């Protein structure tokens, strides 16, 4: 039994899953005067959320200020409107990567609260928003973060013209996507501008910029593989996707972009040595792989409302995941069944039920879950042996691992 204790009363929940649900319904103000007892993983999870909610408040305030500075009133109205679309997408993220930058920064126990990490965190969140804008074009997605995507927003606006010309529909989509590319590009360079204007005099500026560029390059390399693999498998006479292929996407696109990169940026800002950063990057690699496996499991079995995107999009996009590669390598007959749905748009609920059933009965879901848990456990074990991270922040990192395991979106 896990105890949730504050000044006035005590609440008991049965397990970490219940604690996670309870925390999600609370807020940072409520959590400040509360402690959790009875289970180490629960205590670690709670420590992470207390840290995360604090950083979330700071980042939301900072991103609002940054977003307001994006608007240049001397710009053409069309540019101002486009910039407002960037701002619309740049303000409602989960800020997990920003929190990892803060965690990497504070993990040296600098005994200060000077928020030096904030411009770095907001620049990274702006980069993330920008690459997701491009990702939405690549995936032909209509929803992101529970909102319509930028191309869809423009497309809806163009529809109001009631133009009936023969090529209007095709041109409308092309222009909407083109604007999405332009706005994503704008966000990339605004993120760079934030970094340069805030850290040009920092003694670690070159290290920050080099690492930031490495993260961006790795992410784009991973995206290239992620785009080509499903197309090649679906339409070209090439060998089937293997687990090694999938792991290469996970390494470049997710492990670096979502976990290794942001935490390492915070460490550079805190002036950790290159050797210490390399050790943490090796540790965080497994965590990044586990993070993506969880994402892919949620992409099939998650709740659409919580995910903020279509629950069938991974299947419609013929996305190559560890679930898919497991069946491709182990069960040709079930792969044939899976191909009835993979790459098909507008899948019905019963279609997705059949996909879920295939992944479950073949053991693909269990296989993916077991690897994910192994990655998380390995990260925890290695973390115990790291001597240069402050113990308080080790607990928060451990809590973050538990969060990744139990998250539902």
Language model features by range: what are they?
Residues 8, 12, 16-124, 129, ...:
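Conserved N-terminal diphosphate/IPP-binding helix and adjacent helical/loop segment
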Residues 75-127, 244-287, 323-328, 376-409:
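Alpha-helical phosphate/pyrophosphate-handling elements in metalloenzyme active cores
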Residues 103, 123, 140, 211-215, ...:
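Short acidic/histidine-centered micro-motifs embedded in hydrophobic/aromatic stretches
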């Amino acid at each position: 039994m896990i105890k949730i204790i504050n000044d006035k009363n005590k609440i008991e929940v049965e397990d970490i899953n219940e604690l996670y649900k309870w925390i999600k319904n609370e807020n940072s103000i409520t959590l400040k005067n509360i402690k959790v007892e009875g289970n180490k993983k629960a205590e670690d999870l709670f420590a992470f959320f207390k840290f995360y909610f604090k950083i979330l408040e700071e980042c939301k305030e900072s991103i609002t200020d940054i977003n307001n500075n994006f608007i240049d009133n001397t710009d053409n109205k069309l540019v101002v409107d486009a910039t407002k679309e960037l701002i619309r997408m740049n303000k409602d993220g989960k800020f997990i990567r920003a929190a990892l930058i803060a965690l990497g920064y504070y993990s040296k126990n600098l005994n200060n609260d000077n928020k030096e990490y904030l411009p770095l965190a907001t620049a990274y969140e702006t980069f993330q928003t920008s690459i997701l804008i491009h990702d939405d074009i690549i995936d032909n997605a209509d929803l992101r973060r529970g909102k319509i995507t930028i191309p869809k927003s423009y497309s809806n606006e163009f529809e109001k013209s009631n133009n009936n010309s023969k090529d209007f529909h095709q041109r409308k989509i092309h222009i909407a996507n083109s604007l999405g590319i332009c706005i994503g590009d704008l966000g990339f360079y605004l993120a760079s501008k934030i970094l340069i204007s805030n850290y040009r005099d920092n003694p670690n500026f070159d290290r920050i910029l080099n690492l930031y560029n490495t993260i961006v390059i790795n992410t784009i390399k991973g995206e290239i593989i992620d785009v080509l693999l499903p197309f090649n498998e679906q339409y070209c006479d090439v060998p089937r996707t293997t687990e090694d292929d999938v792991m290469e996407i996970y390494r470049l696109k997710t492990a670096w972009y979502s976990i290794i990169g942001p935490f390492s940026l915070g460490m550079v800002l805190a002036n950790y040595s290159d050797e210490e950063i390399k050790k943490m990057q090796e540790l965080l690699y497994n965590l990044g792989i586990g993070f993506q496996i969880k994402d892919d499991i949620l992409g099939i079995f998650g709740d659409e409302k919580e995910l903020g995107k279509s629950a069938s999009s991974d299947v419609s996009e013929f996305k190559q995941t560890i679930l898919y590669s497991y069946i491709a390598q182990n069960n040709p007959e079930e792969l044939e069944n899976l191909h009835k749905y993979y790459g098909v748009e507008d899948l019905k609920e019963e279609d997705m039920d059949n996909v879920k059933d295939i992944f479950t009965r073949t053991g693909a879901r269990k296989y993916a879950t077991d690897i994910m848990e192994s990655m998380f456990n390995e990260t925890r074990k290695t973390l115990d042996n790291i001597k240069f991270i402050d113990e308080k922040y080790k607990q928060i990192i451990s809590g973050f691992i538990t969060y990744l395991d139990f998250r539902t979106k």
